[in-house]
């Protein structure tokens, strides 16, 4: 093969990237391209933009880092702005390419984009060769095909762990033979994408920087320098600080890190330092991530229906004003509000927080869970279609769980933030309150409000619902 185009999507790395590796192995010249698709920066059908400021910054950093890595190997990355179905086929035709190599993903919009590109390429007699690059287990290695897998995680995990193996990560190509004379193109600014620059906040748990280089530095810091993997399961439900959890998710979501490469790092750590339940638990969480990817392969667009894959007939509330109170962190329920304010200011929220705010929106307020999932899509720096929508459906009782479930945010706050350090970090207006009262300020008497200088409805909102009565009714 003379020329291949590599269309980068959510696989912004050179290490363990079968899309890039196969193109380099097959073609004499390789033209890598990334296109900033305007459809990813427009408003979703639920209102918020699909990509907010924090993720837009992370994405452009990741693209710039990928370009640097390719240039280190004698190649380059062409950066364009436009819909892939236009940009990629036009580039391939002008270059006289024999094939275009690209990542494949299971979600609906991602599939549609690939189909549109494939159709335009087919008209020009050019093949689209897709590679599965973003999970720990390859779908071809599963004991049961994704379309037939169990809808419950534990049976699927046990079957998969017993019968499947994780493929070895592939090395980065030593050279990428990109021809001379191409116009690389600038990496667009956040503003030119139609996105506002995100706020900065010194309370953020970590300064997330996009790119494979930064992702590997985070792995080095967390696993090797900090030696935190040995206590991962024990600390993973924390709320404050850089190292209570791995925080690898932004780099996994953008494809800056490969799950297989990360698995190899865990194995190396277990060989060189310690193997215990904590080290296994990171692989366990990667399996959870896989599970939702394969569930999307099975159910596709059904995940986006109000009743989810369980096709439940639930009359969801669509009170926009109430939803905005939740989104802005103004519900009057501190554990919910603190988490939402952290998300809005930093683009990140702990897993414990995500479960609680989702359960509160769908279970306590009864608001259409898809509004919450779309809001997370806009705000999260580590947004992944399958993980986000799969977890939201799970918490709303319409996904991969046959049980109706909810989190009691009162007891969750007391358990995971017993000293109220987290909520007072993000809700400083409650800092004068004793911890037990700070978690449930709606119980303050008028005299106590005067004593502590916290007036409900003025300094901090009254709760949007009678929280105690609502939990009694669930």
From Swiss-Prot:
Transmembrane domains' residue ranges: none
Any Gene Ontology biological process: photoreactive repair
Record's keyword terms, sorted: Chromophore, DNA-binding, FAD, Flavoprotein, Repressor, Transcription, Transcription regulation
Gene3D superfamilies xref list: 1.25.40.80, DNA Cyclobutane Dipyrimidine Photolyase, subunit A, domain 3 (1.10.579.10), HUPs (3.40.50.620)
GO terms, molecular function: deoxyribodipyrimidine photo-lyase activity; DNA binding; FAD binding
Family of the protein in this entry: Belongs to the DNA photolyase class-1 family.
NCBIfam families registered for this protein in UniProt: crypto_DASH
PANTHER family, per database record: CRYPTOCHROME, CRYPTOCHROME DASH
Protein name (Swiss-Prot/TrEMBL): Cryptochrome DASH
Biological source species: Natronomonas pharaonis (strain ATCC 35678 / DSM 2160 / CIP 103997 / JCM 8858 / NBRC 14720 / NCIMB 2260 / Gabara) (Halobacterium pharaonis)
Lineage of producing organism: Archaea, Methanobacteriati, Methanobacteriota, Stenosarchaea group, Halobacteria
Chain's gene name: cry
